[in-house]
């Protein structure tokens, strides 16, 4: 009977807060700041607790201390004349906040979250009432002892970190940790040590998973994207990928080539590179791009069932005249220097290119940090998740024009809806974990690349990825990528209801939660669609998208009061 009663007590507790983030794209500072403040949940708690008993500036001070305790303590010490008095007041305030954020959880769960060094003391403080005079005196004795023994700083830091942890019960990353930004490896380090989280893989995550599995076309794409945005930190410092062979090859091959169209987008670079280094990055960018097109052609030829023959474009170049011939029309090329391409056999890798990609392949396969992070992605991730009447997936659900599920052939079978996401999930795992040398492994490896750019891939769902056209052709119409029907039909409530039913998610409070497509506020777009059945929360963390969206994106918080959509604004530094 006592066990039943205990279960009922746990069930009757307020709902733990869920935090949804998506499309972080390597922006680790913004990511860590949003984690620290729980998208405003900490501020809301502080306002609830102290109300009008504190001035706004005082409440802001408490919040800043909770977010960045080490930094804030240094500022306080330089300012305060009576530090012990500040310690006494602040520790009492932090105890109240900690009591509030821990009240949703059982004592057992809270105890498991406590820092070992201060576990007993924090338990005493959390479970004593400050209203009763005797208890209030007891709390003050504990706090005074902390101060007199010179442990106040350490204790404040421990309390602030505990508040951060208890404010969020579970974290959902709805895809795209990787790409563009300089700190995907730092984000993964944070997640590997996070107390409760899950990941719904995004297209950029899958690309990195393909690279870590040994797909050379994925490896080339990963490097190309890094060069495009001059973000080499994740590759070199994060994962120890040796780019020296690529640098040497690029300098030799394109020594007299300005490679103008391959100049990186410096607005989003991870450092201030000098002219010589930028020149080298530009050459490396061109070298790996040409290699990528050749490697992708190998997969396209090997897998005609992918239906991607129209993405083999090098053979449509008239190298003598410097034009691209497509569907009877000619387009002048923006770059006509191709020293590694044989016009008679344009997709054949030169001996030097093959040797280069073999070296880079080995570097990816031997990176221990990359292996650790990929294991984390596989352990805590998947193509979709159903949680508390919410269906989470990063990008798309392939649909026909009439809203029915699109049947996608994989191997000898067709898959659609939930079955399609389950099958692609299984293939991504097979590509990484299965032994080399089997046809199953070989097909899965190729399919991971298809998940990056294939027309019927739920992580992509466009008619093409116009990489070649964007680089070499100045025609916007030719570079246009047409999205699948999902991206327009998802505005209809009946379509969203059909998708939810496919995953056995029912009820008036069920939702689909997506990322992938930035919500362009400045163009009047809304994150809430289909009469509230679909929420698009592309985090907009990526600085590359912020000029287009007008904001730094959205996050979502789901607490005992309901769903709360949080608007993020840009800032020179999150700490500001």
Sequence positions of predicted segments:
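Low-complexity, highly charged intrinsically disordered N-terminal segments
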Residues: 79-160
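Non-catalytic, alpha-helical, charged scaffold/linker segments
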Residues: 51-93, 232-340
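Active-site loops and adjacent core secondary-structure elements that bind or stabilize anionic groups
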Residues: 8-9
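Single conserved hydrophobic/aromatic residue that forms the stacking wall/gate
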Residues: 1-5, 569-576
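Active-site environment of divalent metal-dependent phosphoester hydrolases
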Residues: 27-28, 179-182, 204-209, 513, ...
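Conserved beta-sheet core of the metallophosphoesterase superfamily
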Residues: 186-192, 196-199, 214-227, 406-416, ...
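Low-complexity, serine/threonine/proline-enriched polar segments
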Residues: 62-113, 237-262, 422-480
């Amino acid at each position: 009977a006592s066990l039943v009663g205990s279960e009922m007590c746990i069930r009757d507790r307020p709902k733990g807060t869920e935090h949804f983030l998506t499309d972080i794209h390597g922006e680790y500072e913004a990511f860590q700041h949003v984690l620290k403040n729980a998208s405003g949940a900490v501020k809301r708690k502080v306002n609830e607790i102290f109300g009008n008993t504190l001035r706004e500036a005082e409440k802001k001070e408490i919040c800043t201390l909770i977010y960045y305790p080490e930094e804030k303590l240094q500022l306080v010490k330089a300012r305060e004349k009576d530090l012990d008095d500040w310690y006494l007041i602040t520790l009492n305030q932090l105890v109240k906040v900690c009591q509030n954020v821990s009240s949703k959880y059982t004592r057992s769960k809270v105890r498991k979250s406590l820092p070992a060094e201060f576990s007993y003391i924090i338990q005493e403080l959390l479970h004593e009432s400050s209203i009763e005079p005797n208890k209030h005196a007891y709390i003050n004795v504990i706090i005074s002892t902390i101060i007199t023994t010179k442990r106040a700083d350490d204790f404040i830091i421990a309390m602030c970190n505990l508040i951060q942890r208890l404010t969020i019960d579970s974290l959902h990353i709805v895809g795209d940790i990787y790409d563009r930004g300089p700190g995907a490896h730092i984000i993964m380090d944070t997640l590997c040590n996070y107390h409760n989280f899950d990941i719904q893989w995004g297209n950029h995550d899958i690309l990195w998973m393909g690279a870590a599995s040994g797909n050379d076309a994925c490896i080339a794409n990963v490097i190309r994207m890094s060069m495009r945005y001059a973000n080499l930190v994740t590759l070199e410092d994060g994962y120890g990928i040796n780019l020296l062979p690529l640098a040497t090859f690029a300098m030799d091959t394109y020594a007299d080539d300005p490679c103008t169209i391959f100049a990186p987008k410096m607005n989003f670079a991870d450092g201030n590179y000098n002219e010589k280094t930028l020149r080298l990055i530009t050459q490396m960018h061109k070298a790996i791009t040409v290699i990528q097109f050749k490697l992708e052609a190998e997969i396209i030829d090997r897998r005609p069932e992918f239906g991607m023959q129209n993405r083999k474009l090098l053979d449509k170049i008239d190298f003598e005249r410097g034009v691209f011939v497509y569907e009877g029309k000619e387009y002048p090329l923006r770059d006509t220097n191709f020293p590694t391409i044989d016009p008679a056999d344009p997709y054949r890798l030169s001996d030097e290119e093959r040797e280069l990609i073999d070296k880079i392949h080995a570097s990816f396969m031997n990176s221990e940090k990359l292996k650790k992070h990929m294991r984390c992605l596989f352990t805590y991730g998947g193509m979709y998740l159903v949680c508390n009447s919410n269906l989470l997936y990063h990008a798309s659900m392939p649909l026909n024009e009439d809203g029915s599920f699109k049947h996608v052939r994989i191997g000898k079978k067709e898959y659609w809806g939930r079955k399609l996401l389950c099958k692609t999930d299984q293939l991504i795992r097979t590509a990484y974990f299965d032994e080399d040398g089997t046809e199953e492994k070989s097909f899965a490896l190729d399919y991971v690349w298809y998940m990056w750019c294939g027309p019927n891939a739920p992580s992509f769902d466009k008619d093409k990825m116009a990489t070649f056209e964007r680089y070499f052709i100045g025609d916007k119409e030719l570079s246009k990528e047409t999205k699948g029907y999902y991206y327009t039909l998802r505005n209809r409530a009946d379509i969203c209801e059909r998708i939810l039913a496919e995953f056995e998610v029912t009820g008036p409070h069920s939702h689909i939660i997506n990322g992938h497509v930035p919500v362009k506020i400045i163009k009047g777009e809304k994150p809430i669609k289909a009469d509230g059945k679909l929420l698009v929360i592309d985090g907009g963390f990526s600085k590359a998208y912020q000029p287009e969206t007008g904001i730094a994106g959205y996050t979502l918080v789901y607490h005992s009061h309901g769903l709360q959509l949080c608007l993020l604004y840009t800032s020179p530094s999150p700490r500001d």
